[in-house]
C-alpha cells in the first residue's frame, strides 16, 4: 500500500535536494518492499524527477513503478508537449512511465486540460499507444461537481485517480463523496495528503491521549495512514517522507497493516469534529434565496471552515476562490495586500443580514 511521494525531500541550506539523505530514504523503502515512487515536473523546482532517476537507476526497471505528472502550469498556445515529455523521460532516466497523471485537475486548470486547440489528452494518448505511458490518470484537489463533470466527459480515457483523502477532509472537503464517485466508476484510487500536509501528525494533547489509550504502540501519523489504508478501493497511499524516522514509522505501519476497527473509526471521526471550529452549514441553500448579493453562501462557508482550520496550508491544497470573498469570510488567510477596497466592503455590507 505504501508509496513514496518525492515532494518533500530533505534539502540543503540552499534549498536543493540533499541527495545523500534522500537517497538513503529511497534505498530503505525499496529494500523493504516499497515499489511505487511518485514525482512531478514541478516538485523541488524540477529537481525531484532528476533525483528519482538517479536514485532508482541501480535497481531493475521492472522492479518498481514510476509515476510523474504533466506540467500543467506551462501549458499555453506556445507549449511544446514533445519537449516537455521528453525532458521528463531524460530526467527520470527511463523510456516509459508506469503511471502518468494530468496534474491537479481542478476548476482553474480545467479549461487548459480540456481546450481542444491545446490537445493535451491527444498527445498523452499517443504516448500511451507508443508504450511511453503504461497507465494514464489524473490527480485532483478540485471540488466534487468539477470532478463529476470531468469524469463524465473524459473518464473513458482515465485509468486511475489520485485524490486528497484523510480523516479530516473525509467530511470537510467531501473526500468521502469523491472516493465514492471514483469507486462507483470502477477506478482505483491513489491517496495523497493522508496526513494533510503534516497537520494530522501534530494533534492536541487530549486527542493524542485518546489514541494512545487504544493503541499505545502506534504513532499519531499511523492513525492517519491506517484510516486511508482501510478504505477498500485505495491501491496506494503516498507519503512525502523527508526523514528516516518517518520512513521507519511508515514501514512499521504498513508492513504489518491493521485495518481500523469500528471503535477506532469513531474516535477519528470525533477528533476530526473537535478540530474544526466551524460554521455548521448543511448546504440546504435556503439562505441563498434572501441574499441580495447573490452569494454562494454554503460555498463561502466551506472556504471559511477550511481556512479556519488551516490558515497556513500549502498552496497546492488551497481551495481556489475569488480573493475578495476569501478575505471577507476568512480574514488573515491571505495577506493584507488583498484586503477589500472600501467600495467593495460597503457593497457587501449593504446586503448583509437579509439571510
Show the residue positions of the predicted features.
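Active-site groove signature of glycoside hydrolases
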Residues: 89-112
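N-terminal binding-site loop/beta-alpha segment at the start of enzyme catalytic domains
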Residues: 1-64, 123, 129
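Hydrophobic residues in well-ordered beta-strands that form the structural core
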Residues: 38-39, 68, 191
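Beta/alpha (TIM)-barrel catalytic core signal, keyed to glycine-rich beta->alpha loops juxtaposed to Asp/Glu
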Residues: 45, 105-282, 286-295, 299-302, ...
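Acidic (Asp/Glu)-rich catalytic clusters
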Residues: 31, 53-63, 86-95, 128, ...
Amino acid at each position: 500500500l505504501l508509496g513514496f511521494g518525492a515532494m518533500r525531500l530533505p534539502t540543503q541550506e540552499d534549498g536543493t535536494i540533499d541527495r545523500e539523505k534522500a537517497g538513503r530514504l529511497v534505498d530503505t523503502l525499496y529494500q523493504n518492499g516499497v515499489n511505487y515512487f511518485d514525482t512531478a515536473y514541478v516538485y523541488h523546482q524540477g529537481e525531484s524527477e532528476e533525483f528519482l532517476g538517479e536514485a532508482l537507476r541501480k535497481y531493475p526497471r521492472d522492479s518498481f513503478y514510476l509515476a510523474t505528472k504533466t506540467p500543467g502550469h506551462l501549458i499555453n498556445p506556445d507549449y511544446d508537449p514533445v519537449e516537455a515529455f521528453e525532458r521528463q523521460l531524460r530526467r527520470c532516466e527511463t523510456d516509459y512511465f508506469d503511471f502518468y497523471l494530468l496534474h491537479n485537475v481542478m476548476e482553474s486548470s480545467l479549461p487548459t486540460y480540456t481546450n481542444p486547440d491545446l490537445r493535451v489528452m491527444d498527445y498523452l494518448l499517443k504516448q500511451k499507444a507508443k508504450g511511453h505511458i503504461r497507465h494514464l490518470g489524473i490527480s485532483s484537489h478540485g471540488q466534487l461537481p468539477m470532478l463529476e463533470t470531468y469524469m463524465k466527459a473524459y473518464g473513458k480515457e482515465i485509468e486511475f485517480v489520485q485524490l486528497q483523502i484523510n480523516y479530516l477532509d473525509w467530511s470537510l472537503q467531501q473526500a468521502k463523496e469523491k472516493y465514492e464517485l471514483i469507486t462507483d466508476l470502477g477506478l482505483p484510487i491513489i491517496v495523497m495528503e493522508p496526513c494533510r500536509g503534516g497537520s494530522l501528525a501534530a494533534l492536541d494533547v487530549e486527542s493524542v491521549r485518546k489514541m494512545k489509550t487504544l493503541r499505545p504502540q502506534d504513532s499519531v501519523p499511523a492513525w492517519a495512514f491506517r484510516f486511508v489504508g482501510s478504505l477498500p478501493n485505495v491501491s496506494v497511499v503516498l507519503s512525502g517522507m523527508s526523514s528516516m524516522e518517518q520512513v521507519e514509522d511508515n514501514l512499521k505501519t504498513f508492513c504489518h497493516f491493521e485495518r481500523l476497527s469500528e471503535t477506532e473509526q469513531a474516535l477519528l471521526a470525533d477528533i476530526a469534529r473537535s478540530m474544526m471550529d466551524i460554521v455548521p452549514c448543511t448546504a440546504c441553500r435556503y439562505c441563498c434565496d434572501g441574499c441580495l448579493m447573490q452569494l454562494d453562501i454554503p460555498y463561502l462557508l466551506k472556504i471559511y471552515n477550511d481556512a479556519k482550520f488551516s490558515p497556513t496550508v500549502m498552496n497546492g491544497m488551497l481551495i481556489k476562490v475569488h480573493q475578495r470573498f476569501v478575505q471577507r469570510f476568512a480574514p488573515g488567510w491571505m495577506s493584507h495586500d488583498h484586503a477589500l477596497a472600501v467600495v467593495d466592503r460597503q457593497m457587501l455590507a449593504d446586503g448583509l443580514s437579509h439571510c
